[in-house]
């Protein structure tokens, strides 16, 4: 019997032909003005070559002030929007779909880079990511509202650029996560101090984007189990259950969760149960989300583990399996998964090589793809 991994899935306005989702992958292939390089069009078009695929494009700054790393794309300038439009047109020409992940770094941005651009290192509170690291400035009420507006405008810009929707990056210790978790958020106003208050920033940002472009075009990524970049609060499960339940009311296109026991940086299973939780999983969060819309789960999947997740762990839920590194080196990954074709190994050293086409748009298609995929760039 065919795995659910290869069955259709409705995501917002997108009718996917399978459930193999491309993860948002930072690649540092944007120029000094945060405009994606021309080679990004080929890169994304290649990975859209199996019709009906959903790509979540790489984390993209909502404004220059929200950044802190060079060579990362943005979505605020006309030049950025125009280049992204070329990319989304190429993806749609393949019969596939593309969402854009919206990003603000907060306290984990590079303080020197921000200073050069005239910006402060900011966060929910004046708490550094680690001892000895730069101390961010706590955001004012006015700045919080400005950022909510920036996210909404970024969502509008993404739709203008042809994206089918946007995904709020609410995890991995970046700005939204810095409000959600009390390892960073020490505020005593209405943006901190309690579970509902810590959920508020993520919810208000998401609500603003929904009001801007519609709920069918908005999704959220959360990483409850992540303990990197100063995250994983002690009462994590109650905090994220509250947040997920609150987001559920907004009727989003999907919820994206990273699996436990997976390293955010390495995207591979960790050895042994972390923090004494041998049975950690996302089942409680998936249950809380209910049948609102699909849940995407990602992190370290093999073909076997992805099928097991959909067919055995969550047979009654609408689940998508998010793949990262295998999609880097296998542009026709859904086809290879379906037909059991061998994978091209990825080159870890080229993942984050700024501006380079090597290890980016030069991975080969399978021989079968040449015959079975009708259109390729």
UniProtKB/Swiss-Prot annotation:
Tell me its family. Answer: Belongs to the NADP-dependent oxidoreductase L4BD family.
As for what it does, the entry says: NADP-dependent oxidoreductase; part of the lnb gene cluster that mediates the biosynthesis of diastereomeric piperazines. Lna and lnb clusters encode sets of enzymes that produce overlapping sets of previously undescribed metabolites such as piperazinomycin-like metabolites or morpholine. The lna and lnb biosynthetic pathways appear to be part of a signaling network that controls the formation of sclerotia, a resilient overwintering structure. One primary function of the non-canonical nonribosomal peptide synthetases lnaA and lnbA consists in the reduction of L-tyrosine.
Which CDD domains does the UniProt record give? OYE_like_FMN
Name the residues that span the membrane: none
Database matches in SUPFAM superfamilies: FMN-linked oxidoreductases
Pathway(s) served: Secondary metabolite biosynthesis
What keywords sit in the KW lines? NADP, Oxidoreductase
Q: Which protein is depicted?
A: NADP-dependent oxidoreductase lnbE
**Single GO MF annotation:** FMN binding
Organism, scientific name = Aspergillus flavus (strain ATCC 200026 / FGSC A1120 / IAM 13836 / NRRL 3357 / JCM 12722 / SRRC 167)
Taxonomically, which superkingdom? Answer: Eukaryota
Q: Where does NADP(+) bind?
A: 170-173, 257-263, 293-295
EC number(s): the record gives: 1.-.-.-
The record ties this protein, via Pfam families, to:
Oxidored_FMN
